[in-house]
From Swiss-Prot:
The modification Phosphoserine is found at residue 310. Pfam families: Cyclin_C_2, Cyclin_N. Belongs to the cyclin family. Cyclin C subfamily. One of the nine subunits forming the core-TFIIH basal transcription factor. Interacts with crk1 and skp1. PANTHER family: CYCLIN. The gene is mcs2. This is Cyclin mcs2. Essential for progression through the cell cycle. Possesses kinase activity that can be detected when myelin basic protein (MBP) is provided as an exogenous substrate. GO terms for cellular component: nucleus; transcription factor TFIIK complex. InterPro entries: Cyclin-like_dom, Cyclin-like_sf, Cyclin/Ssn8, Cyclin_C_2, Cyclin_N, CyclinH/Ccl1. The keyword Ion transport does not apply. Its main location: nucleus.
Length: 322
């Protein structure tokens, strides 16, 4: 993959950050939706004729708790994709769709469980891997086609309609093919083994923030270094790019730490219970606020149709030939 080509992509422009910018982005999203959710909860309490004050509201999720839930559902999404025997590029695309969505939105606004399913179904369509929505939902516990499709537009919009994801698997293959040329003394079997282990390692670390910080090519080299440091260092020396060595070693260490990191199910369940009480009531179709907004929307639409019909009737009442 050409570095110049990647730097011209929307992936690089919109989805590569510094660590500081990534943290700030998540903090801003959390603050924004915390305020929105609190306002909606106050409206809901008022409609129920209950005390509506900030003191009685349940606590909202912190930035860290939101990130823990996003990472937990990233794990679940990876496991689900594996159970469905979906190709590597589809599961990778789905996880990155999912994580990108929550750089723009909050789990307090959109259910991470539903968005994970929506992201996966969208990834199958973007990669020409046809599955009917009915067949797809047969594999999803207690999920309907309507739920999966309801937020598909929101996901696409949040992704800025950038539905092509640059992944490290193609650069991985390219580097190891190049290695066979520049390192002729190394047995070919070593490269095959390195490829398979590196690919497996990358799949196991798809939930890492590394994908928001570095290009797929550098991530691929980090995976090669993790799997076979000797081959990676010899390749760097042969290509005369020693300045990349510290970065590659750092990425490899980061990915290794990510692989070991797993969220305890109990902790995720605790955050899930907290989330249940601080979800935006406007997303709950049985809430007083949702029913009120729906009635207002229907009334507005009915008035528009009535006005349009009235105008049409007046036109038809006139004889165009007089």
């Amino acid at each position: 993959m050409s570095a110049d080509k990647f730097r011209d992509s929307t992936h690089y422009r919109d989805w590569i950050f510094t660590e500081e910018d990534l943290s700030k982005t998540r903090a801003k999203v959390n603050e924004k939706f915390t305020n929105i959710v609190r306002e909606r909860m106050l409206e809901e309490l008022s409609l129920q004729n209950k005390e509506a004050s900030l003191e009685v509201l349940p606590p909202t999720l912190t930035v860290e708790e939101e990130l823990e839930l996003v990472n937990y559902y990233s794990f679940q999404l990876n496991a689900l994709s594996s159970a469905l025997s979906l190709p590597t590029h589809i599961r990778s695309t789905a996880i990155l769709f999912f994580k990108r969505f929550y750089l723009i939105n909050s789990v307090m606004e959109y259910s991470p469980k539903i968005i994970s399913f929506t992201s996966l179904f969208l990834a199958t369509k973007c990669n020409d891997h046809y599955i009917s929505i009915e067949q797809f939902c047969k594999n999803m516990p207690k999920t309907t086609p309507e739920e999966v499709l309801e937020y598909e537009f929101n996901v696409c919009q949040s992704l800025k309609w950038d539905l092509y994801v640059w992944l490290p698997f193609r650069p991985l293959q390219g580097f190891l093919l190049d290695c066979q040329t520049v390192l002729p003394k190394v047995a070919v079997e070593k490269f095959y083994e390195c490829h398979d282990l590196s690919k497996k390692f990358l799949i196991e670390t798809l939930h890492s923030d590394i994908y928001f910080l570095h290009s797929p090519s550098i991530i691929a080299l980090g995976a090669i270094y993790h799997t076979n440091p000797t081959i990676c260092l010899q390749y760097i020396e042969a290509k005369k790019i020693p300045e990349l060595q510290p970065l590659i070693i750092s990425i490899s260490a980061n990915l290794k730490a990510t692989k070991k990191f797993k969220i305890e199910k109990k902790k995720a369940q605790d955050y899930g219970r907290k989330l249940y009480f601080c979800m935006n009531p406007l997303r709950n179709k049985s809430s007083a606020l949702y029913l009120k907004r729906k009635a207002e929307e229907e009334s507005t639409n009915n008035n528009k149709w009535a006005k349009k019909f009235s105008t049409s009737s007046n036109v038809l009442d006139k004889n165009p030939f007089e």
